[in-house]
Amino acid sequence: MLAVCCTAQAQQRQAQRLNNSDDPGLTLTPAIARVSADAPPGSRPPSADPRDLEGVWWISRYEYLLGPSAGVPPPLKPEYMAILERRIRAKNRGTPEADASTDCRPHGMPRLMESPYPIRIIQTPGQITFLHEVAHNIRRIYLDQPHPAKLKPTYLGHSVGRWEGDTLVVDTTGLNDKTFIDDEGSTHSEQIHVVERYRKVNGGRDLELVMTVTDPVTLTQPYSYTRIYKWRPDIKPAEYVCEENNRNAPENGVTVAK
């Protein structure tokens, strides 16, 4: 059992515990994978307007664990860290436990924003829409209304946004507990609260996201991490058919998570 993750130093020790464990079943998938580079030379430049996010963006790197830094798990309470360890062992045995995406349900938040697939952003009066290639997930960010007084929990929750200067601040609540924080299986409850801060940097060629996650049920403390999405006007999000879940079947024939 891992100790509770209460400080940055403790979180680093947890990461070392997972990455350097004598238990081969706890070996982690490599923490970072490069996804998108800059757009090819000659591509259409991004808008000079810092509030114009319209277009296709592609995450620059992908991480299995969405902790406060690369390869560091979220600050989970001990009982939920035990669940994460169990899921990692099952995956490494070749018998991964099911999650929402196993049967083509949405990935949920904040996990969806880590997907290594491109996103098309569309801006209209009162709303910003994220069209995700992965499983054709759609996020609607409302700019002209607050959260409803009562929310039925859903996979992607309810998102409202506002501009603070050149930064789009998105507040998401009303998430159900049927998904995970990240691809390794870090648990969250229906009390999870996600705040995203988006701003264009590097001459508008990069979209910076600072994500802050809180959950009083499963986490010992709030935590934040940063991601960069590349401006990719040369990319057109493709068809994604989740139901064809055997198209990448491994050689050992294991295609079903239990």
Residue spans for each PLM region:
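Bacterial N-terminal signal peptides
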Residues: 1-5
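PEST-like low-complexity, intrinsically disordered acidic/proline/serine-rich tracts
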Residues: 8-258
